[in-house]
């Protein structure tokens, strides 16, 4: 696959906390902004009630009901989960409560997300036991819940496409200046309302103090179908 800058993007990689942590927002920044507070109109209504995007099951796309979490060992996953919970990107929910919350199909199968990493080639490698390892971008594989959601373009429907700029006509001495900047970690700073949890449980259980806990994403996950629409709207509102 080809990335944003035309570079080749590799296959999914197994996650380790040491490789993921450098690419995440700091504690106190991650999951620190309530998305619904900055949203208005159609986007705010969807944030408060994700059922507005939910399709009838007969219209769901063909997709797996659960996806793999890419970690090479239970110990690696436990460390990763603990770090993400500490930052507020994931939260632990008692399994019996999670089982009642999670979105299921008509056969009773829960829809559960996966997780994997993609190399961030421009970041300095991290050292593990003296060996350099690439920093990984944390990706949530949200194919199962995405298959249940309508398309939602909202604010992005009026963004210009690159081809439209070719139709601009300038005077002889006219200059058209465009600037842009990557918004690092922008998905993981926005916390979504509790009503979204049913769509955002991941395919893994942890045990804390003898109790089984299901992990749920609390933020606008990179890979969520309406993620770009939501974050574009939120940043536009901030700049107004």
Predicted features and spans:
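Non-catalytic, polymerase-adjacent accessory regions of viral genome-replication enzymes
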Residues: 1-87, 91-92, 164-165
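Short, intrinsically disordered, charge-balanced linker/junction segments flanking boundaries
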Residues: 238-240
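Catalytic-core region of right-hand nucleic acid polymerases
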Residues: 5, 60-236
């Amino acid at each position: 696959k080809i990335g944003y800058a035309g570079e080749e993007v590799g296959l999914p990689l197994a996650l380790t906390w040491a490789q993921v942590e450098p690419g995440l927002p700091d504690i106190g920044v991650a999951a620190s902004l309530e998305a619904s507070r900055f949203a208005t109109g159609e986007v705010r209504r969807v944030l408060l009630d994700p059922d507005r995007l939910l399709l009838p099951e007969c219209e769901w796309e063909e997709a797996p009901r659960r996806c793999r979490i890419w970690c090479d060992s239970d110990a690696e996953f436990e460390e990763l989960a603990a770090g993400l919970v500490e930052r507020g990107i994931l939260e632990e929910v008692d399994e019996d409560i999670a089982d009642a919350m999670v979105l299921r199909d008509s056969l009773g199968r829960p829809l559960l997300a996966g997780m994997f990493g993609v190399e961030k080639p421009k970041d300095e490698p991290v050292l593990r036991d003296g060996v350099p390892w690439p920093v990984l971008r944390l990706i949530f594989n949200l194919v199962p819940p995405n298959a249940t959601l309508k398309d939602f373009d909202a604010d992005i429907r009026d963004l210009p496409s690159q081809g439209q700029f070719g139709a601009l006509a300038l005077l002889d001495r006219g200059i058209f200046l465009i600037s842009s900047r990557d918004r690092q970690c922008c998905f993981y700073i926005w916390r979504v309302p509790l009503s979204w949890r049913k769509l955002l449980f991941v395919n893994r259980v942890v045990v804390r103090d003898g109790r089984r806990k299901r992990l749920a994403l609390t933020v606008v996950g990179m890979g969520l179908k309406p993620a770009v629409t939501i974050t574009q709207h939120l940043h536009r509102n901030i700049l107004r």
